[in-house]
């Protein structure tokens, strides 16, 4: 609780004399009220008056006088009982406006779900005296946004360590589990997934029970979700509009883990306002978006997922054919094999197995979404799927079937309602055997398929077309004036395609990928799209030698790539006119120089020059005030501009395999730099003395360099999490105060001349991984290694002179992986190798 209180106290800043409203937002059961109560108990003594108003949502809805009773409580708490005389909400609002300005107060409004409640209880900052603090807890962030709450704190779920402590408090009355119940306790923690409500309920329920009862309870949870948790979470679902409820159920049952944009297209194909819907679900703490590998993915807590699936199943728990969504493989196989399908089913997500009978889809007349997948282990099953037995309901709006086994779609499938078709890696050679005009079809994805030809005159309203890596594709038939609405076209590596001249007429195009096509029409395409809506353009792996100056007319361009264009030596000066360009990829190209005026690309955020032929960076690059990522990996650049420190926004600098000999001191002015990679900089002999001024640096990698020392200023890097010093053959020592880098959680040192590891590293309380390898001259390890209380991985390899490992490592409770190579002793016990 203490770290959470400190995080919230930063927003409160009780020393400040302004009036503040602070929102605490999070999913049901996440501990919002507990946190608010802890802050209230700790800080309310600093205020002249205080009021903790619980259950605002419930009280507001309980009766017509609910709002009035809440106003009366606040006035009574803050004005010594004066609230009892208030006769109506309007009068209460006026009293709150006028009576509270004379006292510095703390007010907690717990579990608010409508802005109207805030209007009646804390309508404006000017209702309150300077120094006052109003804390609002809610599941719905939009309530806070609409009320213009400036400070919003998102409650995070408990870490494993916090969860164990809370559970043990309720189950055993102590901080650690009883040894006999340790395995079962960890199972509870995994099930709860950081949700305090579940942890408290299960801890109290299991308290005093024997081990057999614990095992039975845990087995039951796998089949039947915890009722108390579901009821609490379902309050957020019940408050949704009907269409948002449908979107939520689709995410819980089908779309969890999907790329956000793909999920939006699926939901939109089914008629939902997906962008708004997902935003609302996010604000209600029902879903989250996880950023990974450059994409946003839909995520949701396991218990919220359970809640959604329970809503779908509970009306007919033993009759899955009556469920609106089917996702359990065994139930789907049974429904289809028994021909029990019904009009109740709207969405199915299944995997092809020998037990799937697709004729069973025939009764699902209102099926809007069908998602079929197949694992590589079951590919032989595809051969057994009879083309004649294939049936797709004509109501389908979204059809996704990876590795579809037939050369075209079933003749019985009318597809008049189909909005999106996704059949990547399929055997499809043509979509339909006859000419069907599909006016509703907006998106086709057939990448990696066997497609040979495609008549796009049959899909006049197409918006997205992805045919990337269709190696057999030779012809696209595009009638004149067709595809007026196409915004996305991906023809990457369609090398047998005879002509792409139709691209010149695609007036709505925003995304174009023609990499690997070796185009002759390049200049015409650029010319025809001058002043168009084109935002992303990928001409990678083409035989381009010169770029036309007209490329500077693509004023809306945001992302531009000429990677692997080995014949391209330079860029025209007009490219510097692209005022909205954010990403420029010239990696593996033949580029030898950049325009002197490149600094005019004022919106540029990412510049990739990986393994290009660039030898010199123009000084103008230092004017790129919004540049965040500069990749010089494998470049021939020998030096950075002296004023590189002027690139204020730079957060990642990759100099791996570069010819850099020294780093200008100005680099230490990069206050936003988070990652600095100096791997394989074999000519580098020295690091800047003021490296410690990079106050936000969290990862530093130095590999195969000639550096002789690490500047002591590095110990000032309070946000550094990873420090890797590999094969620095001349490095003899580490800074004495290395232990001052409090945030460090990964330290890896493999340097042959290192003689001593400073004892201060034992102060690194957050260190999780420690590696000391090939330190041939190292004679001793710090005695207090056991003080590294968070250490999980310890790797000691090639330490020729080390014979004893300090016995203190036996104190490391979390150590789960260790490698001690050579002959070493722990507590006098000789070991050859421990893994």
Question: Where are the model-predicted features located?
Answer:
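N-terminal flanking helix/linker immediately upstream of nucleotide/cofactor-binding cores
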Residues: 1-30, 34-43, 54-56, 66, ...
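A conserved switch/coupling segment of P-loop NTPase cores
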Residues: 41-48, 90-158, 362, 496, ...
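Non-catalytic, charged helical/coil tracts that couple and regulate nucleotide-powered enzyme cores
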Residues: 74-87, 130-132, 140-246, 274-276, ...
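Surface-exposed helical/coil interface segments that assemble multiprotein signaling complexes
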Residues: 99-101, 126-128, 178-179, 205-247, ...
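The feature encodes a structural signal of leucine-rich repeats
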Residues: 122, 357-358, 385-389, 406-412, ...
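Conserved hydrophobic beta-strand positions in leucine-rich repeat
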Residues: 348, 370, 399, 421-423, ...
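Conserved "Asn-ladder"/turn position within leucine-rich repeats
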Residues: 353, 375, 404, 426, ...
């Amino acid at each position: 609780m203490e770290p959470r209180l400190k995080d919230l106290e930063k927003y409160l800043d009780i020393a400040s004399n302004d009036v503040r409203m602070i929102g605490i937002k999070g999913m049901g059961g996440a501990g919002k009220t507990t946190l608010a109560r802890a802050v209230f108990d700790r800080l309310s003594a600093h205020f002249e008056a205080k009021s903790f108003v619980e259950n605002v949502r419930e009280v507001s809805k309980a009766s017509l006088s609910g709002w009035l009773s809440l106003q009366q409580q606040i006035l009574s708490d803050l004005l010594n009982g004066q609230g009892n005389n208030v006769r109506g909400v309007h009068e209460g609002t006026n009293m709150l406006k006028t009576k509270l300005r004379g006292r510095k107060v703390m007010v907690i409004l717990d579990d608010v779900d409508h802005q109207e409640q805030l209007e009646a209880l804390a309508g404006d900052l000017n209702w309150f005296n300077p120094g006052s603090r109003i804390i609002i807890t809610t599941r719905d962030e939009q309530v806070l946004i609409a009320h213009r709450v400036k400070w919003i704190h998102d409650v995070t779920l408990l870490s494993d360590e916090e969860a164990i402590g809370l559970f043990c408090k309720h189950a055993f009355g102590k901080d650690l589990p009883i040894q006999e119940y340790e395995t079962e306790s960890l199972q509870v923690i995994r099930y709860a997934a950081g949700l305090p409500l579940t942890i408290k309920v299960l801890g109290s329920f299991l308290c005093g029970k024997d081990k057999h009862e614990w095992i039975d309870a845990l087995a039951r949870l796998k089949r039947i979700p915890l009722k108390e948790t579901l009821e609490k979470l379902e309050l957020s679902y019940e408050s949704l509009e009907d269409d948002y409820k449908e979107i939520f159920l689709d995410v819980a049952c089908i779309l969890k883990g999907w790329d956000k944009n793909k999920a939006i297209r699926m939901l939109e194909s089914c008629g939902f306002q997906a962008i708004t819907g997902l935003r609302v679900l996010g604000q209600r703490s029902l879903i989250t978006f996880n950023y990974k590998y450059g994409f946003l993915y839909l995520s949701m807590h396991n218990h919220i997922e359970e809640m959604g699936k329970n809503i779908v199943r509970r009306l007919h728990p033993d009759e899955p054919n009556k469920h609106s969504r089917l996702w359990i493989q065994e139930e789907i196989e049974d429904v289809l094999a028994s021909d029990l399908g019904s009009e109740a089913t709207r969405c199915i997500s299944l995997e092809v197995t020998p037990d799937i009978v697709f004729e069973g889809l025939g009764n699902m007349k209102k099926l809007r979404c069908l998602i079929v997948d197949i694992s590589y282990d079951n590919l032989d099953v595809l051969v057994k799927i009879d083309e004649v037995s294939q049936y797709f309901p004509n109501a389908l709006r979204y059809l996704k079937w990876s590795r579809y086994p037939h050369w075209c779609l079933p003749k019985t499938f009318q597809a008049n309602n189909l909005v999106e078709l996704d059949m990547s890696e399929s055997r499809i050679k043509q979509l339909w055997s006859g000419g069907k005009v599909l006016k509703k079809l907006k998106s086709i994805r057939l990448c990696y398929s066997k497609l040979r030809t495609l008549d796009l005159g049959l899909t006049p309203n197409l918006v997205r077309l992805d045919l990337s890596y269709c190696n057999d594709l030779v012809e696209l038939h595009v009638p004149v004036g067709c595809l007026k609405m196409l915004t996305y076209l991906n023809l990457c590596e369609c090398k047998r395609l005879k002509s792409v001249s139709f691209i010149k007429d695609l007036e709505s195009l925003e995304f174009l990928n023609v990499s690997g096509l070796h185009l002759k029409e390049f200049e015409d395409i650029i010319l025809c799209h001058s002043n168009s809506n084109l935002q992303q353009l990928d001409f990678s792996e083409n035989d381009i030698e010169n770029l036309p100056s007209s490329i500077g007319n693509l004023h809306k361009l945001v992302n531009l790539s000429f990677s692997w264009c080995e014949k391209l030596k330079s860029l025209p000066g007009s490219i510097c006119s692209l005022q909205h360009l954010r990403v420029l990829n010239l990696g593996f190209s033949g580029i030898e120089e950049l325009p002197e005026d490149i600094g005019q690309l004022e919106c540029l955020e990412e510049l990739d020059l990986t393994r290009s032929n660039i030898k010199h960076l123009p000084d103008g690059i230092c004017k790129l005030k919004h540049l965040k990522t500069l990749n010089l990996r494998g470049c021939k650049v020998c030096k950075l501009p002296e004023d590189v420190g002027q690139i204020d926004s730079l957060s990642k600098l990759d100099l791996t395999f570069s010819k850099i000999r020294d780093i200008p001191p100005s680099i230490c002015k990069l206050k936003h730099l988070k990652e600095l990679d100096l791997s394989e900089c074999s000519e580098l002999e020295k690091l800047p003395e003021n490296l410690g001024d990079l106050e936000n640096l969290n990862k530093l990698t130095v590999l195969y360099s000639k550096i002789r020392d690490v500047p002591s200023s590095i110990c000032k890097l309070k946000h550094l999490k990873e420090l890797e010093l590999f094969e620095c053959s001349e490095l003899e020592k580490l800074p004495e105060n290395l232990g001052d880098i409090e945030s460090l959680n990964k330290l890896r040192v493999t340097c042959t001349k290192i003689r001593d590891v400073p004892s201060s590293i034992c102060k690194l309380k957050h260190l999780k991984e420690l590696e000391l390898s090939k330190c041939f001259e190292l004679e001793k390890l710090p005695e207090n290694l056991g003080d590294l209380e968070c250490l999980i991985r310890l790797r000691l390899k090639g330490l020729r002179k080390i014979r004893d490992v300090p016995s203190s490592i036996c104190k490391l409770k979390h150590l789960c992986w260790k490698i001690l190579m050579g002959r070493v002793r722990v507590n006098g016990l000789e070991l050859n190798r421990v893994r």
